């Protein structure tokens, strides 16, 4: 790895982190050397760069040095292909067979493409085999599995290209499919679309084109229960079930990312891929950027197609009253995160808070929300009739009970970089203060204080417009584009005939007449703020408004209406000023996932990976297991469990511990599972050839083990609950030491599958901090290595803004409390179990400031070293965008976990990881110690970091330009790579006074039942002008309640029975009525209440909101089905005589 290009201060920072990491590893190695863990040393290898991560992840020696060499002279993608070729040819690494070399080559290449972070190269590729074509030649078969999804479409597609590049180098022929195989792919991918989901589904002809021409066979493991019907039992396809990995690579990889594959094919001058031109030409883009540009940005309703009850719609697509787009970046936005005023959060009934995910209309699919109070908040109509804009959170709480309607929900701050990342045409910018300031500076020689310019009086705004021809200030620019010519003329006429204008600049309009003639709604559409007093509408500082209507201060018409249907242009012509659109672009949005700040548990939760079978009851309680008896005369605490047996080489004692009582380290005791004979020094059984295993059913005196564990850590047996597991998931059935579970139960912490204690939080970016926001002082920041604020001033005050260092994190107070409990557990473990000194010595969460953490994202296998520097009341985890990107995450609503460094290096073991597909995902198989901006996910390179956007940017947005056309004039991180500025001196365009402002938790989390949430959702929809409440009701019924009712009804008729004592499940009730295994009661798993759950609310909502007759009829039919199933309609038993007439009797 080359030397990190950074300032002296950043070098000190990195060196400090690595020195402390080295010290922690030495302590952990000293503790583990005693033999209390599966390995006597720390099991998380360190990696300074991408090359190290790839070598550690795949395990091919020599790869790191070769990658570093290749990356000095070629791009990442080219280096990935070349390293794959060299591994296959044997230049790097050594393999016994050609097949093994090809498999390693493809895994190494894919790991390079995914920065050595995700688990896809080891979990997403099951195996690589060599198949035979009908002409006798060999071809490569790559077997993909479900976890390949985590690699992303581009890496999936390029892994196929790698396969072709490798096979050419070692002389393997291309794949020549049979016609029935081609049709099998067509059927299978379309079936996968129905049973699972695809981002992009290619047409049948596109699938045939890919399969017939792809030189590598894209194969896969069966992942779905669904089976193909038409093309079954094919000779070269080993299953009739759907192969999910294959479908993902072909559809979301090759088909969707064909242009990117073509680019690399051209660069490498590879033949045989000409068919990509046909694929690209025939593929439907689903609305490309160019098409959208031509159509002047049409509304998109994709984000509201699948509504969920309880998660409100805040604005229908591009509708007036919805979020008004504002360009810019705050210190807590960008990287797919957007900002809104915290007053908007409060007035939207607390559904949105920091970290809440919104599904948005554009530029991407989703965004996590952050509080930015320097942009405009919502405009609301109070029950008094007043129309007020609320920019202050305190005022929002005070006025919330008085709000009748939300006329406009305020601005949403989205940075240019998100448009660039999504390749979305730039939407027209509103005429905002930042743009007006450029016009003011160009035209006006006066120097007026900026605060006065931000909130000018009407007199100042008009004087600047008249004297210097500066456009009318945004404060006095109304939403003229939201009304038509007839409405404009009606408003103008009403003001002339019935308005009065006093000497203080207040326009008075009669309230009753305003309602009768529809004038008050027009004022609300225009966002002309006003008060209602004594049957009058009062518009203060109204002269700019009056002038834009073409009237003078006496409310006399100055000029006739111009011949135009553009009311912004009309206002400009009539006033004589330059008037620009105030809100030309609206962004539709609905709630996605709520924010998260919670401890990570397995399901069911566990505190130690120690098996107790069913002996601990349904809670898997070790306390109960220690008192378990199999029968009346059985030995107390004797249980039968599956464990990996080990043998001491010195004294021959059999145990499951890693170190014998005599002090020697033990070895697995292997035996044949079929022949039951010991197998020593061989890979297979000498009799039957099977692979031996150390796993066996063991009768364990658990009571003795349990008591001994308490004695070992000096704790009293006073605990009520210590949660173990029924059965271990790892291949060798390796248990954790029981002592660890005792200490975790003492401190009330829980573990994940690898033995580590984790805490989950929603990801939010943060590039700048203030000590007073983080619960610390400037003095503490100085201790942590911060020296100056963003303006170069010495750091002296708590309110100074400083640039966040790339591996520093801010976590929630709740997370801090959990980490404090974890730190106390780790110290107890070090002292009482490992017999070394404590490490943290923490009594309060403030003592944790400065400790090292590991950050880890789901679906990845590389942790990132971080440092805790403070706490926030928001339920999120703040970190530098580079930190999130180094885990291959952005901030569109993703959530990741943290763990204490010492907990990770002390307790993590690969031996505990499940031996199944995906078992190595979400585990720190490697630890990145230093973040290099060049090696993080490229999305982070598109973040803009100027203090203000250039004037050319605002002008370009009016032409709906592609964002790539402006890269050269924007200060992007991509332009700073390879310089010390890549780490420091970032700026932002919009500040916020408190990154954690807003509700503490989304009301989605605080409301009780789903019906309560639904009522709150519809109540809010009724109040928001930009939302069509009946449409929301219809969509929720169709996409949530009705499918749930149908699914639950089906589940009821197909359900299994469950024993409430041991959890055993039965297809039908046992004849005895009791569980044959343990004698416990057997109950239904689906109850009548679950089936009826949403029926009454569906009927009520259907009536209240007048949903379509088709939807109402569906509800009626379901009501009939449910009643016929559950209601006992008593039928009178009739005899034959009841059908005879009286005379016949």
Swiss-Prot record:
Keywords noted in UniProt: DNA replication, DNA-binding, DNA-directed DNA polymerase, Exonuclease, Hydrolase, Multifunctional enzyme, Nuclease, Nucleotidyltransferase, Transferase
One biological process term in Gene Ontology: DNA catabolic process
Catalyses which reaction(s): DNA(n) + a 2'-deoxyribonucleoside 5'-triphosphate = DNA(n+1) + diphosphate; Exonucleolytic cleavage in the 3'- to 5'-direction to yield nucleoside 5'-phosphates
Keyword Membrane: no
Highest taxon of source: Archaea
Xref: InterPro entries: PolC_DP2, PolC_DP2_cat_dom, PolC_DP2_central_dom, PolC_DP2_N
MF annotations from Gene Ontology: DNA binding; DNA-directed DNA polymerase activity; single-stranded DNA 3'-5' DNA exonuclease activity
UniProt-listed Enzyme Commission number(s): 2.7.7.7, 3.1.11.1
Classification via NCBIfam families: polC, PRK04023.1
Subunit structure: Heterodimer of a large subunit and a small subunit.
Family named by the database record: Belongs to the archaeal DNA polymerase II family.
Its biological purpose: Possesses two activities: a DNA synthesis (polymerase) and an exonucleolytic activity that degrades single-stranded DNA in the 3'- to 5'-direction. Has a template-primer preference which is characteristic of a replicative DNA polymerase.
Protein name, UniProt field: DNA polymerase II large subunit
């Amino acid at each position: 790895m080359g030397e990190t290009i950074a300032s002296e201060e950043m070098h000190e920072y990195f060196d400090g982190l690595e020195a402390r990491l080295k010290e922690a590893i030495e302590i952990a190695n000293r503790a583990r050397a005693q033999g209390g863990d599966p390995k006597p040393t720390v099991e998380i290898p360190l990696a300074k760069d991408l090359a190290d991560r790839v070598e550690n992840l795949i395990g091919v020696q020599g790869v790191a040095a070769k990658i570093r060499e290749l990356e000095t002279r070629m791009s990442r993608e080219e280096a990935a292909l070349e390293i794959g070729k060299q591994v296959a040819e044997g230049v790097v690494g050594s393999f016994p067979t050609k097949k093994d070399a090809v498999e390693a080559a493809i895994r190494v290449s894919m790991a390079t493409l995914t920065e050595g972070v995700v688990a896809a190269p080891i979990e997403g590729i099951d195996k690589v085999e060599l198949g035979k074509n009908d002409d006798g030649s060999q071809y490569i078969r790559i077997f993909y599995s479900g976890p390949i999804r985590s690699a992303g479409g581009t890496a999936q597609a390029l892994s196929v290209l790698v396969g072709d590049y490798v096979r050419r180098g070692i002389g393997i022929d291309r794949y020549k499919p049979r016609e029935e195989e081609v049709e099998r792919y067509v059927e299978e991918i379309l079936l996968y679309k129905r049973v699972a989901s695809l981002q992009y589904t290619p047409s049948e002809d596109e699938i045939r084109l890919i399969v017939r021409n792809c030189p590598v066979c894209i194969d896969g493991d069966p992942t779905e229960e669904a089976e193909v019907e038409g093309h079954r039992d094919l000779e070269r396809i080993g299953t009739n079930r759907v192969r999910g990995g294959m479908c993902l690579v072909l559809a979301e990889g090759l088909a969707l990312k064909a242009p990117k594959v073509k680019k690399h094919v051209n660069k490498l001058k590879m033949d045989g891929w000409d068919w990509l031109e046909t694929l690209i030409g025939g593929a439907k883009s689903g609305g490309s950027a160019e098409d959208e540009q031509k159509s002047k940005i049409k509304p998109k309703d994709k984000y509201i197609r699948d509504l969920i009850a309880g998660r409100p719609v805040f604005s229908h697509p591009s509708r007036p009253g919805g979020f008004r787009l504002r360009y810019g970046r705050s210190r807590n936005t960008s990287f797919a995160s957007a900002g809104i005023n915290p007053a908007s959060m409060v007035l939207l009934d607390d559904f949105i808070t920091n970290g809440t995910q919104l599904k948005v209309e554009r530029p991407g699919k989703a965004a996590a929300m952050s509080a930015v109070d320097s942009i405009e908040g919502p405009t609301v109509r109070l029950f008094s009739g007043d129309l007020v804009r609320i920019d202050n959170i305190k005022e929002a709480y005070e006025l919330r009970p008085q709000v009748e309607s939300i006329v406009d929900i305020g601005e949403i701050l989205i940075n240019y970089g998100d448009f660039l990342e999504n390749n979305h045409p730039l939407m027209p910018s509103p005429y905002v203060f930042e743009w007006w300031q450029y016009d003011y500076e160009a035209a006006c020689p006066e120097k007026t204080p900026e605060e006065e310019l931000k909130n000018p009086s009407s007199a100042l705004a008009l004087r600047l417009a008249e004297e210097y021809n500066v456009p009318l200030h945004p404060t006095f620019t109304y939403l003229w584009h939201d009304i038509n010519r007839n409405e404009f003329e009606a408003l103008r006429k009403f003001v002339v005939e019935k308005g009065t204008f006093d000497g203080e600049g207040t326009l008075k309009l009669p309230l009753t007449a305003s309602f009768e003639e529809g004038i008050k709604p027009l004022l609300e559409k225009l966002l002309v703020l006003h008060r209602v007093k004594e049957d009058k509408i009062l518009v203060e500082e109204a002269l700019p408004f009056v002038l834009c209507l073409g009237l003078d201060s006496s409310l006399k018409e100055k000029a006739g209406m111009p011949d135009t249907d553009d009311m912004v242009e009309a206002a400009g012509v009539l006033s004589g000023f330059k008037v620009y659109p105030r809100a030309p672009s609206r962004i539709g949005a609905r709630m996605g996932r709520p924010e998260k700040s919670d401890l990570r548990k397995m399901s069911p939760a566990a505190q130690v990976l120690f098996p107790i079978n069913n002996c601990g009851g349904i809670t898997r309680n070790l306390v109960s297991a220690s008192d378990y008896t199999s029968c009346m005369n059985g030995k107390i605490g004797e249980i039968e469990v599956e464990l990996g047996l080990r043998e001491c080489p010195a004294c021959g004692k059999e145990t499951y511990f890693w170190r014998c009582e005599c002090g020697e380290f033990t070895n697995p005791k292997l035996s044949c599972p079929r022949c039951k004979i010991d197998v020593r020094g061989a890979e297979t059984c000498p009799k039957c050839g099977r692979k031996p295993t150390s796993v066996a059913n063991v009768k364990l005196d658990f009571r003795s083990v349990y008591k001994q564990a308490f004695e070992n850590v000096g704790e009293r047996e006073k605990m009520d609950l210590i949660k173990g597991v029924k059965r271990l998931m790892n291949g060798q059935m390796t248990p954790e030491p029981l002592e660890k579970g005792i200490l975790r139960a003492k401190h009330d912490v829980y573990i994940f599958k690898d033995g580590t204690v984790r805490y989950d939080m929603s990801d939010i970016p943060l590039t700048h901090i203030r000590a007073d926001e983080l619960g610390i002082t400037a003095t503490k920041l100085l201790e942590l290595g911060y020296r100056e604020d963003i303006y170069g001033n010495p750091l002296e005050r708590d309110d100074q803004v400083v640039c966040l260092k790339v591996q520093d994190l801010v976590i929630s107070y709740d997370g801090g409390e959990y980490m404090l409990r974890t730190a106390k557990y780790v110290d107890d473990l070090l002292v009482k179990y490992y017999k070394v000194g404590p490490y943290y010595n923490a009594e309060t969460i403030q003592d944790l400031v400065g400790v090292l953490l590991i950050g880890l994202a789901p679906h990845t296998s590389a942790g990132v070293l971080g440092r805790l520097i403070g706490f926030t009341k928001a339920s999120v985890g703040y970190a530098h965008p580079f930190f999130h990107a180094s885990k291959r995450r952005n901030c569109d609503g993703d959530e990741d976990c943290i763990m204490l460094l010492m907990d990770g290096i002390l307790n993590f073991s690969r031996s505990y990881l499940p031996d199944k597909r995906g078992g190595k995902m979400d585990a720190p198989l490697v630890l990145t110690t230093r973040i290099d901006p060049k090696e993080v996910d490229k999305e982070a390179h598109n973040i803009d970091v100027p203090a203000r956007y250039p004037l050319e940017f605002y002008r370009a947005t009016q032409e709906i330009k592609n964002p790539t056309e402006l890269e050269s004039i924007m200060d992007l991180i991509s332009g700073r790579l390879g310089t010390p500025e890549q780490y420091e001196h970032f700026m932002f365009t919009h500040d916020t006074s408190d990154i954690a402002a807003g509700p503490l938790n989304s009301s989605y989390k605080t409301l009780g039942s789903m019906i309560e949430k639904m009522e709150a959702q519809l109540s809010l929809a009724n109040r928001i002008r930009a939302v069509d409440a009946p449409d929301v009701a219809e969509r929720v019924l169709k996409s949530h309640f009705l499918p749930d009712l149908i699914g639950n009804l089906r589940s009821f008729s197909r359900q299994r029975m469950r024993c409430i004592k041991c959890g055993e499940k039965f297809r039908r009730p046992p004849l005895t009525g009791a569980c044959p295994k343990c004698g416990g009661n057997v109950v239904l798993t689906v109850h009548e209440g679950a089936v009826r759950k949403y029926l009454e609310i569906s009927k009520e909502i259907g009536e209240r909101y007048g949903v379509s007759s088709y939807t109402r009829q569906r509800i009626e039919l379901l009501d009939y089905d449910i009643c016929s199933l559950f209601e006992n309609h008593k039928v009178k038993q009739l005899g034959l005589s009841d059908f005879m007439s009286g005379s016949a009797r």
